[in-house]
Amino acid sequence: RDTDRSRGLGDVYKRQEEFNITEKINQLPDNKSIKLENVCFTYDGADRDYVLDNVTLEIPQNKVTAIVGASGSGKTTIIKLLLGFYSPLKGNIKIQDVSLDDINPHLWRARLGAVLQDSFIFSDTIANNIAIGEESIDKKRLLQAVEIANIREFIESLPLKYNTKIGMEGNGISQGQKQRLLIARAVYKNPEYLFFDEATNSLDANNERAILDNLMNFYVGKTVVVVAHRLSTVQNADHIIVLDRGKIAEQGTHKQLISLKRSYYTLIKNQLELGM
């Protein structure tokens, strides 16, 4: 496992700045682009062995940005920094020109949806797992969410349908069904930002293809970051960033990166054994 995959969601509650909420900015900038400026990070706080080493990149608003790289290259760490679970050891993360550390974390989390490798399924009904925290569930949004996540047929085949109780960590459902429920949860929220970390890696090819096609329409007008290794998940992204041992190796579109025949080309070639 990547070292950056082993940190749980509970880490978010340890952030010191959450004790200073009243001093935080309560409005996001009009420009929703995200900038990482000379970001260095390591989990143990030491000034060495950076998981991210002087990373500078821009995630443009209303576009799909994919992040790829070998295991341990720092992909998941970028997602956790974007979520506000941690702050950079050096450098800055900005929304337009506002530091993410200066934005109210409750506001920030309200505006984003995420599917992570350690996202949680609660001991509750399917409907309540999708529409988290909603006193009154919007049935139209619920149906849209399960359609996009390609899980409506499965749910409606169950005797209690959306009122079916599922257990902690998704007991009683497969890993693929869990991922589809988590995608439905993110879609139901209808956020301005979407962060997906290997959100479809447990799905078979047919389910993944259907969901990715559905998501392309849902992504319109949203700022999206997708961490993935499957070619099918990233090739249609507006921009692809290739990480190698915590540094940016190259970036561009799928077509541009394939033509360069460097890091991305090698990743894809090795994965698919195309012999290109």
Residue ranges, per PLM feature:
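Active-site phosphate-binding and catalytic loops of NTP-dependent enzymes
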Residues: 19
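ABC-type nucleotide-binding domain
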Residues: 16, 25-276
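Single conserved hydrophobic/aromatic residue that forms the stacking wall/gate
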Residues: 2-13
